[in-house]
Amino acid sequence: MCYIWFIKNLKLPQIHLFFFLIFGISITYGQIPTSYYSSAEGLSGTDMKDALNDIIDGHVKFSYTSSNTDVWDILKETDKDTIDPSKVILFYSGWTVDGAQEYNSGSGWTREHVWAKSRGDFGTTQGPGTDVHALRPCDVSVNSARNNRWFDFGEDEYIHSDGPTGCYKNSNTWSWEPRDEVKGDVARMIFYMETRYEGENGELDLVVIDSIPNDNNTNEPIHAKLSVLLQWHTNDPVDDWERNRNDVIYSYQENRNPFIDHPEFVNEIWGSVSSVENHSINKNLE
């Protein structure tokens, strides 16, 4: 009985450690079931995207900040440094920081909404605001520099006080270009968000567009830039880091990022870079 009370008052990472220490059980993260994507096989375009939505929606949702398992806890597992697991790897810079330094009055790390939370104005509400598939640890200053910029090629390198980050920004187009090592990661997270949130059950309908809006302050549920993201997806293919991260998130949220498991799904839905101008999701923002 005391075991039950004790476990209920632990967070998930602590529960994993508890079972390992007490019972010698090694908990492995869930792998993709053989039939997970079977309903999407043989489809393309909107039909495939809708089928994938049916597969990955209804996931387990966690709070942004809570005394129970929250986004902070999950990110410490998904993005931990494999050399020093007490640290997390900061997404845009590639630097590491003590995982326990959650924000820490601005001197630690924060949570980056890769699909900017103002693009749809969903904030940190459960669902798009707490979906770990599109959240990454980030240096506080770098997070502020990225702001809610669109994803596109930049011109001016963003130099942090600790040194170069490999990221670029463009003030004229309000765009952000991440370092080469995570360009594909960004693309696949953005594609996940459009696929997961299609406007059902009162949720937002997130859409990736291929034009930079004139109004950078718009809170419409859109993000750019599709043709650039397709290029990044191709040039920076899925690696073992992303695959492992997908597995860890699956063990919590019970859904996966299809574009990590099957990168070919991207072209099946959005086409290639050369065909993107004809894609039906482009919309008139005027």
Language-model region placement:
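Bacterial Sec-dependent N-terminal signal peptides
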Residues: 1-33, 276
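A generic structural signal for short, non-catalytic loop/turn and secondary-structure boundary residues
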Residues: 18-23, 83-84, 104-109, 252, ...
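Short, charged, low-hydrophobicity "junction" segments
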Residues: 27, 61, 162-166
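N-terminal module-boundary/linker segments of secreted carbohydrate-active enzymes
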Residues: 30-96, 268-269
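Short clusters of hydrophobic/aromatic residues that line enzyme substrate/ligand-binding pockets
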Residues: 91, 259, 276
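Short, surface-exposed beta-strand/loop "edge" segments at domain boundaries and coil↔beta transitions
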Residues: 97-101
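Domain-level detector of nuclease and nuclease-like folds
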Residues: 103-273
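Residue-level detector of functionally pivotal "anchor" positions at catalytic/ligand-binding pockets or at interdomain
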Residues: 272-286
